Amino acid sequence: MPLLETRDLCKSFGGLQATRDVALSIDAGEIRGLIGPNGAGKTTLANLITGIYAPDSGDVRLRGERIDGTRPSRVARAGIARTFQNTRLFGSLSARKNLLVSYDAVSGSALVSPAAARERAGHLLELSRLAAVADLPAAALSGGQRALLQLSCGFMHPRLALYVLDEPFAGINPVFIETILELLSHHRQHNEVAYLIVSHEMEIMRRICDRVTVMIDGAIYFEGTLAEAAANEGVIDAYLGRPV
């Protein structure tokens, strides 16, 4: 059974059909890239998976259980975290406090003591190289540091199964990108976290993705490795423009 599965997922906004019969499956521990031209429906699909939008038809299943149509908070507690292209943090709170607030939001009935949550936050601050700025307000951090903090907030989830990342590398200094990649690898290796990564950064996607899904005009056009996508004439014409 796949970790995540969408079936015939459709969503329209007025006369615009943003997704059309999207059928996607992701296995535990998989890193899946989601690529395609602007307006292809990638972010809409991410929003459908994470409960921000309810589908017009079709369904979303996590470990076989339907999660579509439920509140984003319930989807999060079920094991799905999400980052946004525009970083969402509590600017007046310290980096450490942002992590602890994130844990409180998703922990539910998880039996983790406050001391264990603080230890988890400290460990993540070390992994993300943010320990030196742990007690600074998030608003005082650089763009790269805020991106790392937002990513780490999702890793506070005690039952994280799938992490949906929307343009996590856009506008980020290469030094911070390497730290992001280290974090993704660490949690995949130790916790079998799966990722759905929306990005236009093809060189990075080549390095980390097991497979990519190409969306065009709201529908899945191609699935395979990035090398296979880069050799597909339709993908080249509609999106890549040239081999990568």
Tell what function each PLM region has.
Residues Y163-E167:
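Catalytic Walker B motif of ABC-type/P-loop ATPase nucleotide-binding domains
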Residues I35-P37:
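The feature captures the beta-strand-to-loop junction immediately N-terminal to the Walker
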